[in-house]
Amino acid sequence: QKGNAGELMYTNPNHPYAVTGLTPLAESPVKSHLDIVYTAAERPSIITHGIQKAVLTYNANHDRIRMQYSDNSRNLLTRYYLGDNYELDVDSTGVHERLYLGGGYYDASAVLMKKGDISSVYFIHRDYLGSVLQIADAQGNIVEENNFDAWGCRRNPSTLKAYTIGAAPKLLLGRGYTGHEHLEMFGVINMNARLYDPVLGRFLTPDPYVQMLDFTQAFNRYSYCMNSPLCYVDENGEF
């Protein structure tokens, strides 16, 4: 039994750590089905859920540089990534730019947001894992408040209950748990090298590295941070 997900099943003896099935709870926020295509470097390339589709593009170093999100062949969002501190979104409302100040996606304390000719600075309040808990405008007004369980599942800050599918408010920065990008339309978090399901508390693909040969948890290649999410952060999906 896993929190608000339901009962997990492990029925493949050749892959004892791989989840083969799930009996979800009545209000489980886990997505029922995702089709994912990977690159030769095992990075997620195409993610499909029903009529929703995201196409991810990488550079020669396997760093994500663009995401195109569409719905029934209708482009809804194109997002560009530059370095580790700049993002540009193009959608039906125009062009939105985000430049992180004093750091990158995972540790910056402020962000300069620009839409058209209007620029605004917002201050990012994080917890010790780097998760975005609050965002304040230049006048100190709280414009966003977030809460996450230990595994990164989004919760209502007032009730501490997990949001049901489609009920979570849009993230101002598109990022939340440990500073990573939430792909709310697919119910996963993009941790760069791999996709992570915060409801299951597991990665969707195995870790290509074993970091600690003398620690049993390191051999569960689907686990997140050796099953110690309050102690460690996986910044790139591999280490």
How should each PLM-predicted stretch be described?
Residues 165-167, 212-221:
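A short, polar/charged loop-to-alpha-helix boundary motif
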Residues 40, 60, 128, 197-199:
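A cytosolic small-molecule/anion-sensing beta-strand core signal
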Residues 1-121, 142, 157-173:
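Acidic/glycine-rich beta-solenoid
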Residues 26, 40, 179-183, 195:
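Short, flexible loop/turn elements at secondary-structure junctions
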Residues 135, 153-158, 194-204, 208, ...:
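Short, low-complexity export/processing leader segments characterized by acidic and small residues
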Residues 7-12, 93, 117-192, 226, ...:
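A motif-centric feature for acidic-aromatic and gly/ser/thr-rich catalytic loops and repeats
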